[in-house]
Amino acid sequence: MTSPYTTPEGWAGWTQAARDAAYDNLKGVADSAAQVANRNTLSEAFRAAHAGHLDLPFGSGAREQWDLYPAARADAPCLVFIHGGYWQRNRREDFAIMAEGALAAGWSVGICGYTLAPEASMTRIVAEIHAALDWLGAHGAAHGVAGKVVASGWSAGGHLAALAAEPPLVVGALAMSGIYELAPIAETNLNDKLHLTPAEIAAHSPIRRPVVQKPIAIAYGARELPELRRQSRVFHRHRAEAQAPGALIPVPEADHFRVLEALWRQDGVLLRAAAEVLAAAG
């Protein structure tokens, strides 16, 4: 389908440096390195304290593994979290802290990894997320995870979470700071490793796919880069025009990295949003 997303006014005349900067969250947030280091430290401690169901393989790749944090009840809802890094950076272990608030609130949590570009194409990455969900449906109960699944993800993981709403196992999604139209990414330096093809852009841009009539909350930080904010707003408007459920949630004062705290804290607005997605799914 034709994408309802359009590039910014004058995009064709932008320099390559300007296009790259439009999606460069690390440079766009002054203290990004400190925030990442803090998240990694918190995640290392959390993971060490919850080591019972880690490194569970769902595929043959080294990164194709789950870390599961089961609730006291196997039938508790499960929040799946998919990490970001523009499909080419980061690892699931450094996002373990994302389970803290949900686990305290009675959810189970699953954090899955996936093979990164350039080793994996976008097509392979999307397939790995679907394989991870298939594994969770088949084997999660053996690890105490058998409840309804809400898929969540941040940045590139927001893109993957939006696509993860399609499989039957998943009742809804929380997409945070995501990319929903891939075409502009192909015109930035991020594509040096992604090597996106026109067919992949068409097939794996959530905004071009048939609208999923499940609740998908779409969140972003109010202080994100303009293009990240716009991607979220356009995707939400596209879904709303198709009467698809799900809130648009700009998180006040949050940049691209600080927005994660709204999910990992038990009183966070995005953890509440995940609960609202679950309730809306019925």
Residue spans for each PLM region:
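N-terminal cap/lid segment of alpha/beta-hydrolase-fold proteins
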Residues: 18, 22-73
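Short beta-strand element of the alpha/beta-hydrolase
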Residues: 76-85
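Alpha/beta-hydrolase
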Residues: 82, 176, 251-254
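Alpha/beta-hydrolase active-site loop signature
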Residues: 86, 114-118, 180, 255
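Catalytic nucleophile-loop/oxyanion-hole region of alpha/beta-hydrolase
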Residues: 90-99, 110-148, 262-265
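Primarily recognizes the serine-hydrolase "nucleophile elbow" in alpha/beta-hydrolase
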Residues: 131-193, 201
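The feature captures the conserved acid-bearing segment of alpha/beta-hydrolase catalytic domains
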Residues: 172-175, 187, 196-237
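C-terminal catalytic histidine-bearing segment of alpha/beta-hydrolase fold enzymes
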Residues: 219, 229, 233-236, 240-282
